[in-house]
């Protein structure tokens, strides 16, 4: 059974997402949120609420696609991975921004709209991937992937809460009971994070999230590439009858024989998006705190980068 007619064109477009990475890496543009937010702008939105809204797009797109899929039902491994995916977004879209997180920096509307578009496409692709390219069985690769996902997920949550504790009063801290006042007064927003992998890198929450989704992808698709049917075959398929124009336009540029599975395309998109921001953020930390910032601390990979 072929996946939905929009799947391959959408996946090809999703592969183009990493092309934006050099723009951020070389500092041409910093996405206006967090430490790089524009403090005064009419296009700024409430940080906590807008974060929740843009992140909810992904699980909504995921569930909508699963419910409307032409596949009768997901197999057991795919149901487990769906549960892990939804657990991540329950925390990321609801628990973290609306319950746990202190007041966040404002989000520029361009960030929110771009994230909503990305999450819409990603949720759709991951759902189709689990439905039409499911893991075959619960073998050692699947179990190892789920264990790795669990470590990455809780590592991500733990280090996020260390950052949140920097903005909480002492009586409301969740992870750290005592924090050194490195280079900042109580009135300043940013302080030097300590604890966990922060002793070695500036962005352990990023590293843990990469581990989380790489292991999820390993459980879903141990072999990262999926075969793409030849274009003449797709054009003859009844379910693709209404998409001839779109397929023909794309084929004028490139029609691959293989593509990254949606889960691995997501990992690539995450790393290429977050790595430049980690490097830029690490430089920002060193500039702001000077000699008070640990010289041995790397940006995102201990001892390497």
Regions found by a protein language model. Give the residues of each.
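Hydrophobic transmembrane alpha-helices
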Residues: 1-24, 62-66, 74-75, 118, ...
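Eukaryotic endomembrane system proteins
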Residues: 98-143, 150
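Juxtamembrane membrane-interface segments at transmembrane alpha-helix termini
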Residues: 94-98, 124-125, 157-158, 277-280
């Amino acid at each position: 059974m072929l996946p939905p007619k929009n799947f391959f064109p959408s996946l090809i477009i999703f592969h183009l997402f990493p092309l934006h990475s050099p723009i951020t890496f070389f500092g041409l543009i910093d996405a206006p949120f967090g430490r790089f937010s524009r403090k005064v702008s009419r296009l700024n939105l409430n940080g906590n609420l807008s974060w929740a809204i843009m992140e909810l797009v992904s699980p909504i797109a995921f569930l909508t696609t699963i419910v409307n899929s032409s596949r009768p039902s997901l197999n057991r491994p795919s149901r487990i991975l769906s549960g892990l995916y939804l657990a991540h977004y329950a925390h990321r879209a609801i628990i973290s921004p609306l319950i746990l997180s202190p007041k966040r920096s404002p989000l520029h509307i361009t960030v929110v709209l771009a994230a909503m578009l990305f999450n819409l496409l990603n949720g759709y692709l991951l759902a189709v991937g689990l439905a039409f390219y499911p893991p075959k069985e619960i073998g050692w690769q699947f179990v190892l992937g789920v264990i790795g996902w669990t470590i990455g997920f809780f590592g991500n949550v733990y280090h996020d809460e260390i950052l949140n504790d920097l903005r909480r009063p002492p009586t409301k801290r969740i992870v750290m009971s005592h924090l050194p006042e490195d280079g900042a007064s109580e009135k300043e927003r940013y302080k030097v994070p300590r604890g966990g992998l922060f002793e070695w890198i500036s962005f352990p929450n990023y590293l843990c999230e990469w581990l989380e989704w790489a292991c999820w992808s390993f459980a879903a698709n141990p072999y990262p590439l999926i075969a793409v049917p030849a274009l003449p075959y797709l054009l003859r398929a009844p379910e693709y009858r209404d998409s001839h124009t779109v397929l023909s336009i794309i084929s004028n540029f490139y029609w691959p024989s293989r593509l990254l599975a949606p889960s691995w395309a997501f990992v690539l998109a995450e790393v290429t998006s977050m790595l430049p921001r980690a490097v830029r953020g690490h430089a920002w930390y060193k500039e702001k705190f000077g000699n008070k910032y640990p010289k041995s601390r790397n940006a995102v990979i201990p001892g390497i980068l």
